[in-house]
From Swiss-Prot:
Residues 418-619 are annotated as: Interaction with WDR82. Transmembrane segments: none annotated. Residues 644-655 have a biased composition (Pro residues). This is Serine/threonine-protein phosphatase 1 regulatory subunit 10. Residues 357-433 are annotated as: Necessary for interaction with PPP1CA. The lineage of its organism: Eukaryota, Metazoa, Chordata, Craniata, Vertebrata. It comes from Pan troglodytes.
Length: 940
């Protein structure tokens, strides 16, 4: 039926057997069949057809059958569907059908049809539909009111009939009267008996505590009051319908006329608790009584009435009404012989239940904020009321409460989903908290997005389509006179030209040729304070220029040499007078512009050429100034000082050796001897005691100073605890040579000492020295002559010249210069350059790089300021043979003493140029030069 388009005429023809001529359903069976077809209907045409058939049907039996079969539920489904789809014609048809059906309150309670219709009456957009729905709602409200009012009326009629029957039969049949009474009052009595029995139990219980079981005996005697009690209860059953709140005081007043007076004011109490009382009272009556009476028998009932002091007096008299009641009520139960048993059973059944109430009654106490006495009264009275409440309460409920409840529901459903609501209005704290959480999450997500946003283009840019604009109808400024005035003005004014580009770029590079600075000759008087030194240890490294301006043109080596020569032109340099530095430089470099300094440095024999040219002038002796120390070459002339000596300052002797650094990390020239040293520096014999003397040295001099010497004004230190300043004697006199770079080499005891550059080896005790550069003659070996007159080492080896005249012995290896100027003489090993560290000549041993460290065995001499390095005694004599062992050169190396290393007044030294230019010196307190305010008084 629901597949293709439906023709209503065809549909009616198919249903013709069930319908009469007017389209009305003929029989009850026909409506069942039509209902089954309606369930299958999906199209709007067929549904409207069926609804019209129902509208034509007038028979209430058929319509009631339709509702009972399920037609009302089906219409509810159709109504819901059409409301969601907002199908207004179908909605109107359904509302008309609902209006036509004979619906009752029970039918309306089955589903939410009434609510839907109510919503349509309020919120429908179609005015006709709203009117129709409101009419239907008003009809249904009338049905509800009529039914709720008819029900209690019918019940009252039944009651009156029963009572009338019982009364009329009284004179005729006294026996039947009792039965009729009991039957007529069965329903109320049964309900009443339970509460009454409860009432009896409660006071009996209370009195049981006080007086015992006496209550039960008097209760059987006064039977006469039966009628009066029944009449009173009947009166209350009939008249006071809104007694639902009376439970508080109803029970005590049941038996006595004063109770009537109490009832009336209590009737005015609000009805809000009607339903609650009906629900709560049935389970509680016995529980409250037993528990509360047991707790408080007499005094508590006085407090029971609600916070009103006036009411205390009637409550005080209430125990007597209870007693009276207990007596009367059993009598009421007595006339019917078969019934007394059930009340007793109820009592017995309730009594065991009394322990339970303690749980529930306290709750009532808390909620009502009443003392137990008040509650005591409540449950006692409530049993009397529940009968009235249940019967009358239901009637009343059907009349009034459904309406109020509907109003409440209607108010709730007024907020329809289709209704416009202010969404942004915060309803409660929960909503506010939700919004807060959402806003926080949103803020966090945006922050995270922004933090990870690399500003990359996500959507490719698309060129917008060009807009084709129509030509303007009016040319702007066509009638303007100002443009002519401006044109005339521009004829007599220079045009403003802006030649620079619109978008700025980097400025054009300006070509320029660096002009070499002019070479200014050194001033001999001023050069004393400008002793340069070089940061790096490589021979090709850039050195500080002696004059700041002229040196920038020279290669570093020449700059160093110039500085050293300039520094050496002091009053104590006898051989320096006849040297013209400018001529030497010109001869070395050729014409100033012929070769750049870089090309000169790349020549392999460049440094050798310089040395060969400088040797005849006696300039080679100082050695490379690159390390800050102009070491005295082995053949250097004695008078060739390379620094202006201070008063009593130390002076390097000609006996070779770089003289050793004067302390840890100490740069600068070594101090000259004080007042000459006849032992080492004989007058007129520059080589005396030097490395060229192979014979035994002069007489023993056990306490000669180490190479470092003492500070300018220091007193000579006491002799060290170890024997001999140059190393321990091993069976002979002290060595007369200064072996090793700054360290005395043990020459005795069968050790074959290893000589450093310029170190003359003592040949005492028949020891054969190993010939280093400038060493003594080896046995049968013819030493080669090194520059500066020092003889090369033995064994046919031609030593290489270390720059500055220190010749390293050994197999053709060119030693590297340590900053102390001493050259390691080991087999080609490069000693580790610690500033001021004496380099061991060991074969393969790298001496420790501490300041003033000793020789091959790794012994660290004590670098106490002003003390000589002690002779750390090595292995026993004859254990090591020269280069053979791991500690070449014997075990008696001593380190440099710390003559000038720490403290002391350096004001008699030249001012440190580095300190004056940069404000600090990289050698800090170990610098050999004068730092004003640090190692001497500040400058004036």
């Amino acid at each position: 039926m629901g597949s293709g388009p439906i023709d209503p005429k065809e549909l009616l023809k198919g249903l013709d057997s069930f319908l009469n001529r007017d389209g009305e359903v003929k029989s009850v069976d026909g409506i069942s069949k039509i209902f089954s077809l309606m369930k299958e209907a999906r199209k709007m045409v067929s549904r409207c057809t069926y609804l019209n058939i129902l509208l034509q049907t007038r028979s209430p039996e058929i319509l009631v059958k339709f509702i009972d079969v399920g037609g009302y539920k089906l219409l509810n489904n159709w109504l819901t569907y059409s409301k969601t789809t907002n199908n207004i014609p179908l909605l109107q048809q359904i509302l008309l059908t609902l209006q036509h059906l004979p619906l009752t309150v029970d039918h309306l309670k089955q589903n939410n049809t009434a609510k839907l219709v109510k919503q349509l009456s309020k919120s429908s957009e179609d005015e006709e539909l709203r009117k129709l729905a409101s009419v239907l709602v008003s009809d249904w409200m009338a049905v509800i009111r009529s039914q709720s009012s008819t029900q209690p009326a019918e019940k009252d009629k039944k009651k009156r009939k029963d009572e009338g029957k019982s009364r009329t039969t009284l004179p005729e049949r006294p026996l039947t009267e009792v039965k009729a009474e009991t039957r007529a009052e069965e329903a109320p009595e049964k309900k009443r008996e339970k509460p009454k029995s409860l009432r009896t139990t409660a006071p009996s219980h209370a009195k049981f505590r006080s007086t015992g079981l006496e209550l039960e005996t008097p209760s059987l005697v006064p039977v006469k009051k039966n009628a009066s009690t029944v009449v009173v209860s009947d009166k209350y059953n009939l008249k006071p319908i809104p007694l639902k709140r009376q439970s508080n005081v109803a029970a005590p007043g049941d038996a006595t006329p004063p109770a009537e007076k109490k009832y009336k004011p209590l009737n005015t109490t609000p009805n809000a608790t009607k339903e609650i009382k009906v629900k709560i009272i049935p389970p509680q009556p016995m529980e409250g009584l037993g528990f509360l009476d047991a707790l408080n028998s007499a005094p508590v009932p006085g407090i029971k009435i609600k916070k009103k002091k006036k009411v205390l007096s009637p409550t005080a008299a209430k125990p007597s009404p209870f007693e009276g009641k207990t007596s009367t009520e059993p009598s009421t139960a007595k006339p019917s012989s078969p019934e007394p048993a059930p009340p007793s059973e109820a009592m017995e059944a309730d009594r065991p239940g009394t322990p339970v109430p303690p749980v529930e009654v306290p709750e009532l106490m808390d909620t009502a904020s009443l003392e137990p006495g008040a509650l005591d009264a409540k449950p006692v009275e409530s049993p009397g009321d529940p009968n009235q409440l249940t019967r009358k309460g239901r009637k009343r409920k059907s009349v009034t409460w459904p309406e109020e409840g509907k109003l409440r529901e209607y108010f709730y459903f007024e907020l329809d989903e289709t209704e416009r609501v202010n969404v942004n209005k915060i309803k409660d704290f929960g909503e506010a908290a939700k919004r807060e959480i959402l806003s926080d999450r949103h803020a966090f997500e945006t922050a995270r997005r922004l933090s990870h946003d690399n500003m990359e283009e996500k959507v490719p840019w698309v060129c917008p389509r060009p807009l084709v604009l129509p030509s303007p109808l009016v040319t702007p400024g066509s009638n303007s006179q100002e443009r002519y005035i401006q044109a005339e003005r521009e004829k007599g004014i220079l045009q403003e030209l802006f030649l620079n580009k619109e978008s700025p770029h980097e400025p054009d590079p300006e070509p320029y040729e660096p002009i070499p600075p002019k070479l200014i000759p050194l001033d001999e008087e001023c050069s004393m304070d400008e002793t340069p030194y070089v940061e790096t240890l490589e021979p090709g490294g850039s050195g500080g220029s002696p004059d700041g301006a002229g040196g920038s043109k020279l290669p570093p080596v020449l700059a160093n040499l110039m500085g050293s020569m300039g520094a050496g032109k002091g009053p104590q340099g006898p051989g320096a007078g006849g040297i013209n530095v400018q001529e030497i430089l010109t001869s070395i470099m050729g014409s100033p512009n012929s070769h750049p300094s870089e090309e000169l440095l790349k020549q392999p024999d460049y440094s050798d050429k310089i040395k060969q040219m400088l040797v005849p002038h006696g300039l080679l002796g100082p050695g490379p100034i690159a390390n800050g120390f102009p070491p005295g070459g082995p053949g250097g002339p004695k008078g060739m000082q390379h620094f202006p000596p201070g008063p009593g300052g130390p002076m390097p002797g000609p006996h070779g050796g770089p003289g050793g650094p004067v302390g840890p990390r100490l740069l600068g020239p070594p101090p000259p001897p004080r007042g000459g040293d006849p032992f080492w520096d004989g007058p007129g014999d520059p080589m005396r005691g030097g490395p060229m003397r192979g014979g035994p040295g002069p007489g023993p001099g056990p306490y000669h100073r180490g190479r470092g010497g003492r500070g300018g004004n220091e007193p000579p230190p006491p002799p060290p605890p170890f024997r001999g300043a140059r190393g321990g004697r091993s069976g002979g006199g002290p060595p007369n040579g200064r072996g090793g770079p700054g360290g005395g080499m043990v020459g005795g005891g069968g050790h074959r000492p290893h000589e450093g550059p310029g170190g003359g080896m003592g040949n005492n005790s028949g020891h054969r020295p190993h010939e280093g550069p400038g060493g003594g003659m080896g046995s049968g070996h013819r030493p080669h002559e090194g520059p500066a007159g020092s003889m090369g080492g033995g064994g046919g080896h031609r030593p290489h010249e270390g720059p500055g005249g220190g010749i390293s012995g050994g197999s053709g290896h060119r030693p590297h210069e340590g900053p102390g100027g001493g050259m390691g003489a080991g087999g080609g090993h490069r000693p580790h350059e610690g500033p001021g560290g004496s380099m061991g000549g060991s074969g393969g041993h790298r001496p420790h790089e501490g300041p003033g460290h000793g020789g091959p065995h790794g012994h660290r001499p004590h670098d106490v300021p002003g003390h000589r390095g002690h002779d750390h005694r090595g292995p026993p004599p004859h254990e090591h043979r020269g280069h053979d062992g791991p500690g070449h050169g014997g075990g008696g190396h001593r380190g440099h003493d710390g003559g000038h290393s720490h403290g002391g007044d350096m004001s008699n030294r030249p001012v440190c140029r580095h300190f004056m230019m940069k404000g600090n010196c990289r050698y800090e307190n170990n610098c050999a030069f004068y730092h004003p305010g640090v190692n001497g008084p500040p400058l004036p």
